[in-house]
């Protein structure tokens, strides 16, 4: 089980609901991923029309917990306003907070992120902030009241995997009591397993599954990878070595030397 504020969740894989080839494939992929938390963009939901109604109906059928996000917001004011609208629409105090600074990298505006988190937490929100792997930013978010931190592995949709392993490991070491979720930049199941092997509590994925040739099969692959990585972490990984170490003990004289 992993703790998200006052809730215990079984699945350590969170999944996004955008970019799938069709609504039916989205639903099948989410179901096969085993995810219990699904992120939803407020802007997509409020687009209206039959397509929006169909989308929301499919999400409800899955019986998952919806985590609305402020994707696309580029200012504190815009993010706070979007979060408040999401709370009314989805009847939840959870919000995945995104404040974007740069259009090319979609890097978070960490200054605006902290400010928006402070405002929302004072207003009763439980904030899931999308941030960089910078420890100082994470500490400020924790000081603001965030109990979940979601650092990126690499830019959104880049599929590059973990680009700053040492920084992510430092976050885990320094924030042992905070729920840490790697969010953005993972492109392969092996990337998810690596994040879990670092001791992260969960990963959030969207593009890597939605844009796969077979999104449903890829959802299953990521599900297994997350479970394998978590089990490996719990089992205790051996440390890397600079030199070889024989796996077979060499004791005494080789048996063939004793043959006359």
Curated annotation (Swiss-Prot):
Name its cellular compartments. Answer: Cytoplasm
Catalytic residue positions = 96 (schiff-base intermediate with dxp)
What GO terms describe the biological role, i.e. biological process, of this protein?
Answer: thiamine diphosphate biosynthetic process
Q: Which GO terms describe its molecular function?
A: thiazole synthase activity
> What Pfam families does the entry give?
ThiG
What SUPFAM superfamilies does this protein map onto?
Answer: ThiG-like
Q: What is its main location?
A: cytoplasm
Name residues in a coiled coil.
none
Matches recorded under InterPro entries: Aldolase_TIM, Thiazole_synthase_ThiG, ThiG
Q: Does Transferase appear among the keywords?
A: yes
Described purpose of this protein according to its UniProt entry: Catalyzes the rearrangement of 1-deoxy-D-xylulose 5-phosphate (DXP) to produce the thiazole phosphate moiety of thiamine. Sulfur is provided by the thiocarboxylate moiety of the carrier protein ThiS. In vitro, sulfur can be provided by H(2)S.
Supply the name of the protein.
Answer: Thiazole synthase
| UniProt source species | Rhodopseudomonas palustris (strain BisB5)
């Amino acid at each position: 089980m992993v703790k998200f504020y006052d809730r215990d969740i079984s699945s350590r894989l969170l999944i996004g609901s955008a970019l799938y080839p069709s609504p039916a494939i989205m639903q099948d992929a989410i179901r096969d991923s085993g995810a219990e938390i699904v992120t939803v963009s407020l802007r997509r939901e409020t687009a209206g029309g039959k397509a929006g109604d169909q989308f929301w109906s499919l999400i409800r059928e899955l019986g998952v917990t919806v985590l609305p996000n402020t994707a696309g917001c580029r200012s504190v004011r815009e993010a706070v306003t979007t979060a408040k609208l999401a709370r009314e629409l989805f009847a939840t105090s959870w919000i995945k907070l995104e404040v974007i600074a740069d259009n090319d990298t979609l890097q978070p505006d960490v200054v605006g992120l902290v400010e928006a988190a402070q405002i929302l937490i004072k207003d009763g929100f439980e904030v899931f902030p999308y941030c960089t792997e910078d420890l100082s930013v994470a500490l400020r978010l924790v000081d603001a009241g965030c109990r979940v931190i979601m650092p990126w592995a690499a830019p959104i949709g880049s599929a590059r995997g973990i680009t700053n392993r040492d920084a992510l490991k430092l976050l885990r070491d320094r924030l042992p009591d905070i729920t840490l979720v790697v969010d953005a930049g993972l492109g392969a199941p092996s990337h998810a397993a690596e994040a879990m092997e670092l001791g992260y509590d969960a990963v959030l994925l969207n593009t890597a599954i939605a844009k796969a040739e077979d999104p449903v099969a890829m959802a299953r692959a990521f599900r297994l990878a997350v479970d394998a990585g978590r089990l490996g972490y719990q089992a205790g990984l051996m440390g890397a070595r600079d030199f070889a170490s024989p796996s077979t003990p060499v004791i005494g004289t080789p048996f063939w030397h004793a043959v006359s």
